[in-house]
């Protein structure tokens, strides 16, 4: 959902940290932020020749209690009609995630976006913006007051 119908436009990390009540796209921004983080971390790990693998995985929209009780039967029916490609299946998505995380065939696949399966795909065009990735990374380091000695050598 990092690329919702109608799209989103990256403004700045401040929007992630302090979303406004009017902004109905904050969930999409949070997903985009996760992908930005994944891609930036992957670049940094490669730069220090690390063997750590990092990927993004979208399980799809699930009928869970995470939405604070907002997933009514009517809402689920509307999503099925209007955005069926956004829905996920708990069993299929969890099995795929477990495969990607543990199966040896994925040992050298890093910096990718998996969408409800074991096949990686391109994420949204916006998610590949390296300036935005770096901006979010730098702000995150600043806001958390992370120090070089608190992390892997060369990652910051």
Model-identified regions with their sequence ranges:
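Rossmann-fold NAD(P)H-dependent dehydrogenase/reductase core
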Residues: 1-70, 145-156
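Residue-level signal for pocket-adjacent positions within structured domains
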Residues: 3-5, 101, 123
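A short C-terminal helix-loop "cap" of Rossmann-like NAD(P)-dependent dehydrogenase/epimerase domains
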Residues: 16-18, 73-82
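Short interface patches used for recognition in eukaryotic signaling and trafficking proteins
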Residues: 21-24, 79-82, 120-126
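C-terminal helical subdomain
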Residues: 30, 56, 81-121, 130-134, ...
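Loop/turn elements at helix/coil->beta-strand transitions in domains of secreted/extracellular proteins
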Residues: 50-52, 77, 109
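C-terminal amphipathic/interface module of NAD(P)-dependent oxidoreductases
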Residues: 125-156
């Amino acid at each position: 959902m990092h690329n919702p119908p109608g799209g989103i436009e990256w403004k700045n990390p401040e929007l992630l940290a302090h979303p406004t009540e009017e902004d109905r796209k904050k969930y999409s921004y949070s997903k985009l932020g996760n992908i930005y983080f994944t891609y930036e971390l992957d670049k940094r790990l490669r730069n220090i020749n690390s063997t750590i693998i990092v990927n993004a995985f979208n399980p799809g929209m699930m009928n869970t209690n995470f939405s604070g009780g907002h997933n009514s039967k009517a809402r689920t029916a509307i999503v099925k009609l209007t955005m069926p490609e956004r829905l996920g299946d708990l069993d299929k998505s969890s099995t795929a995630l477990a495969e990607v995380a543990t199966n040896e065939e994925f040992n050298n696949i890093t910096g990718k976006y998996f969408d409800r399966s074991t096949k990686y795909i391109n994420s949204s065009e916006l998610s590949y913006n390296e300036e935005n990735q770096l901006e979010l990374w730098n702000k995150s380091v600043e806001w958390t007051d992370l120090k070089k000695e608190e992390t892997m050598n060369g990652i910051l």
